[in-house]
Amino acid sequence: MTFRNCVAVDLGASSGRVMLARYERECRSLTLREIHRFKNGLHSQNGYVTWNVDSLESAIRLGLNKVCEEGIRIDSIGIDTWGVDFVLLDQQGQRVGLPVAYRDSRSNGLMAQAQQQLGKRDIYQRSGIQFLPFNTLYQLRALTEQQPELIPHIAHALLMPDYFSYRLTGKMNWEYTNATTTQLVNINSDDWDESLLAWSGANKAWFGRPTHPGNVIGHWICPQGNEIPVVAVASHDTASAVIASPLNGSRAAYLSSGTWSLMGFESQTPFTNDTALAANITNEGGAEGRYRVLKNIMGLWLLQRVLQERQINDLPALIAATQALPACRFIINPNDDRFINPEAMCSEIQAACRETAQPIPESDAELARCIFDSLALLYADVLHELAQLRGEDFSQLHIVGGGCQNTLLNQLCADACGIRVIAGPVEASTLGNIGIQLMTLDELNNVDDFRQVVSTTANLTTFTPNPDSEIAHYVAQIHSTRQTKELCA
């Protein structure tokens, strides 16, 4: 038997994990084992919302050392994280300024300023990326405007996964899939756009040319002295999750469900027409030159904040209580900017319902019901937008990531979208990370080959839409009202 041992470091906004994958070549089987799981979260530091990158690095090294202490020979390591955030370094590789998080308010108002000065259409034609107020483009503008004293000290700007790879190897890399989330990469050249960089105030010399997934960045020397290659995987966690989505045919859509919900489809070409711009669709980079045509949805961040504020520890019990409540009594727009990082999420949700003359969700279950119903309805709207954009309906939706364990939300999604939902794998980002490593090690041919492995080894659950459910009737009523308004217009 020939085995490969690959380690995936998967960092999310609320937690991180070091996972060991064992791949058996002869039977093409892949097993995962969690080595170390640790918390991540936002911190307040000197008036900014930041990440504790030192703590994250320590946790990564602890997890890697645990694998080595077991006497396991690691064949490769890969790191994926969330997008848009970065770390600045000086000529000696020391940090400059703070690792500010995208939920900080420093970039407020700058997106509108960019659209006015550069033109919304021009920015979109250059980058193909959706407009979000915390994109790196606006974060860099905030930094260079508000902290100009830092600029003379900056030599390099590394996105989060590239920073941690640098800390392990001493080598710098700018991985393509994550670089595209910045809204600074030109969609035609796959290189940094000089006009957008100039507006941001950043120096192009801070960045190296983006590289597509699959190259070896450098080597980490383990405590035993072995040199272990660190691979540039699809380092944006959603890009990795999509790689591990067992998409079957061109009519399959995906939903990467976690702190954020990312809904989209794969395409060989980007969509940057007026319809895509109006719908704020993004064309993020994927593996093998594919595009992840998708839309960001605020996701389970709202629930995470409610759980924290209400000190709820028993999520299954909450979901059971939520399921017993009637649907669609409290509806909000999860993508409203007011929910990016409010002081109190529960109060913000209640205020949104109050302002629209709805009943007010008071109990834990009512707040959860509001979030789940609102997300499912938004999923249905976005799926419809995506189908219109490409001119073809979808036949199935693959929900991957930690959020796919929420069976109530999966069923609500199936009912609201009127589409078959396949849930799993849960550890999609980790698996996609491993997939690129195995391709780099010449164990697998390509993404489609890897998806066959995932399909046969992952635990997948199918949810069939129920046209008689409350939320399905609610969606039908909305569509009927819209059609009536269009006829009367």
Curated annotation (Swiss-Prot):
It catalyses: L-rhamnulose + ATP = L-rhamnulose 1-phosphate + ADP + H(+). ATP binds at A13, S14, S15, G16, R17, T259, Q304, G402. Keywords: ATP-binding, Disulfide bond, Kinase, Magnesium, Nucleotide-binding, Rhamnose metabolism, Transferase. Its cofactor is Mg(2+). The active site is at D237 (proton acceptor). It is an enzyme of class 2 (transferase). Substrate binds at G83, H236, D237, T238, N296. Transmembrane segments: none annotated. One of its GO terms (biological process) is rhamnose catabolic process. One of its GO terms (cellular component) is cytosol. Gene3D superfamilies: 3.30.420.40. Monomer. PANTHER family: L-RHAMNULOKINASE, SUGAR KINASE. Belongs to the rhamnulokinase family. This is Rhamnulokinase. It comes from Escherichia coli O139:H28 (strain E24377A / ETEC). The lineage of its organism: Bacteria, Pseudomonadati, Pseudomonadota, Gammaproteobacteria, Enterobacterales.
